[in-house]
Structures are given as C-alpha cells and as structure tokens.
Amino acid sequence: FKRAVEAQDTETILAGFDRIPVKPGECFYVPGGIPHAIGEGIFMVELMEPADFAVRIEFERGGYTLPENARFMGRDIDFALSMFDFTARNLARTRKEFFVEPLELPLVGNAERFSLFDSRKTNCFRLERIRVNGNAAVDHHSFRVLIVTRGNGTLSCENKTLSLQQYDRVLIPYYVQTMRFSGKLELLAAMPPLNK
C-alpha cells in the first residue's frame, strides 16, 4: 500500500477498497483513521469533526495537486499510514459499524424530524433531517447550517423570509428562537454538540 501511495498508483490503492452500495438518504459515520473513498456518481453532504489534520493519499484530483507539506501534515508517509485502521471488514460488518439508523424525534407541526448524528456516534457535532409538508415551526436552541436536499418552500425567522430550493444553504444564527417553514422541503440541519 505504501508503494502504491508513493507512486500514486490509484488503481492499486482502490483495489484495496470494496464498493459499498448506497441509497439516497443513507448516512454513514466514518471515524478518523478509516480509509475511505467517495465513488463516482455519489452526491453527498460531508460533516467533519473539527481537527487540524487530514491525511491524503491521493495527491492530484481534478487538475489540482496537493502541496507536499499538506499531504501528511508535514510528517512522513510512515507516520501518516500509522494513523490508518486497516482492519478488513466485509459488507455486513461495515454496514453494522458505520451505517447510522435515523432516530425519530417528536413531530413539530407538519415537520418530521430525525436525528442522524448525535451522541450515539460522536460528541463533535449533530445532524438532523427535517421533512416539512405544509407549515411548521421548529424551535431553535443553537446556531445551525441548513442544507435543502429536496423540494422548495420558505423559511421565516426574525422578520425575514427566504425562498428555499434544492441545494440552498443557510446559516441560522444562535439568537434565532424559532424557524418557520412552509412548503414541501427536506433539509439537513448541522449543529454543534449539546452542552453537557
């Protein structure tokens, strides 16, 4: 594997990965140190825990070449590879360890809410899926980044109304108490962890 990384032999590198079939809406938690790649045709939202480092084993992508000092955090390849968990996992074990089952939260008006990432998997961030069908008011206890994954509608808060459509992103400040949605929307809401 080390020689393949040094030579940037992506065919050999990718031969060590098994393809995992995924469906729209599925969530996986990939802990630090687990080598992974995003396959062709996958459109996804990626959340990362706050960290000052990332190990890249692919140095060139889409015409951009990663500077040498950014490849292994200023260290050598042996240090970088020592951070990886090379445990072999079959598909069933991979899904069991990393697939996240949505946790249904109480209904809020015409909004279904599901916790995707929470203290079950990480204490670094939270992620909820919100499905609105009509009008719904969602109380707000944190700043959030909203990402519209389907549909269109409006978001009103603090005397402002925004039109929303698929792929829109909105930062909701901490001081906002309630978010009012209308329309048919599916959103992801990324938030910091709950204070203990």
Residue ranges, per PLM feature:
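Glycine- and acidic-residue-biased ligand/ion/polar-headgroup-sensing regions
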Residues: F1-A4, G41, F125, R131-E158
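Double-stranded beta-helix
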Residues: F1-I13, L47-R89, E186-K196
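Loop-centered beta-sheet repeat module
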Residues: A7-I57
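Short acidic-glycine-tyrosine-enriched beta hairpin
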Residues: F17-Y29, C157-V176
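Ligand-binding loop in jelly-roll beta-barrel domains
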Residues: G33-F53, T161, Q165, Y174-K196
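C-terminal amphipathic alpha-helical segment
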Residues: V55-N135, H140
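A structural signal for short secondary-structure junctions
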Residues: G109-N110, S119-C124, A137-H141, L146-T149, ...
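Hydrophobic, well-ordered secondary-structure elements that form the walls
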Residues: I130, G151, Y167, L187
